[in-house]
């Protein structure tokens, strides 16, 4: 089976179908336009998105009256940073920016992929954080840069 567009997302779907197959993906695979995956029922699927579109957790790749195939994003090993002041937020944002490390934000939390050097830096700066496995809504995107 070849999929060229996303049908919808399960979170906004009004009509439920009786059977759901899942495709488990790492968050960094969500940005790849072309990929081959296998459902939890062993069905092989090719994904070739025509439009430049990033996949998301819950996206429906296929649906009929009896079955749907849905993307489920695997949890990432992340550091959830919880600065207690603007000073701490500024310090860690500056440090992570210098490393060109992609970050995501949810509420008052800054989330980065786990890196032992970042963990050591957070401990050194006494900035509160936790290491956890967390399902991310989108991929951590590499940050392009150049210095002149």
Swiss-Prot record:
Gene3D superfamilies: Urease metallochaperone UreE, N-terminal domain, UreE, C-terminal domain
Subcellular location: Cytoplasm
UniProt-listed Pfam families: UreE_C (PF05194), UreE_N (PF02814)
Main localization category: cytoplasm
Record keywords, A-Z: Chaperone, Cytoplasm, Nickel, Nickel insertion
Matches recorded under SMART domains: UreE_N
Family annotation (CDD domains): UreE
GO cellular component assignments: cytoplasm
GO molecular function, one term: unfolded protein binding
GO biological process: protein folding; protein-containing complex assembly; urea metabolic process
Top-rank taxon: Bacteria
Family annotation (NCBIfam families): PRK13261.2-1
Function: Involved in urease metallocenter assembly. Binds nickel. Probably functions as a nickel donor during metallocenter assembly.
Stated family: Belongs to the UreE family.
Name of the featured protein: Urease accessory protein UreE
Native organism: Bacillus sp. (strain TB-90)
Name of the encoding gene: ureE
